[in-house]
């Protein structure tokens, strides 16, 4: 992960450590939005990963989608 991606991951890690236990597990998606953000930053770097994480958080509301929503490019290889 790039240094800037590490910097962007700090608020996400702080949220998971401090706020998440108080808020509860109310994320509509799997993986959770914070796990998605960390994986997106790790896999795609600061710019694209930050953009993917921001888009995901904007979709996480009562009228948004739900269910399994993996980070693009993280699909498991198919076994034929």
From Swiss-Prot:
It is found in: Cell inner membrane. This is Putative membrane protein insertion efficiency factor. It comes from Paracoccus denitrificans (strain Pd 1222). Its main location: membrane. It is a peripheral membrane protein. Keywords: Cell inner membrane, Cell membrane, Membrane. InterPro entries: Membr_insert_effic_factor_YidD. Could be involved in insertion of integral membrane proteins into the membrane. Belongs to the UPF0161 family. GO terms for cellular component: plasma membrane. SMART domains: Haemolytic (SM01234). It holds the Pfam family YidD.
């Amino acid at each position: 992960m790039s240094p800037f991606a590490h910097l962007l991951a700090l608020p996400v890690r702080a949220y998971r450590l401090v706020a998440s236990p108080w808020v509860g597990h109310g994320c509509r998606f799997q993986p959770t939005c914070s796990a998605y953000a960390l994986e997106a930053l790790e896999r795609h770097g600061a710019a694209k990963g930050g953009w993917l994480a921001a888009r995901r958080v904007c979709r996480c509301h009562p009228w948004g989608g739900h269910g399994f929503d993996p980070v693009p490019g993280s699909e498991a290889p198919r076994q034929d």
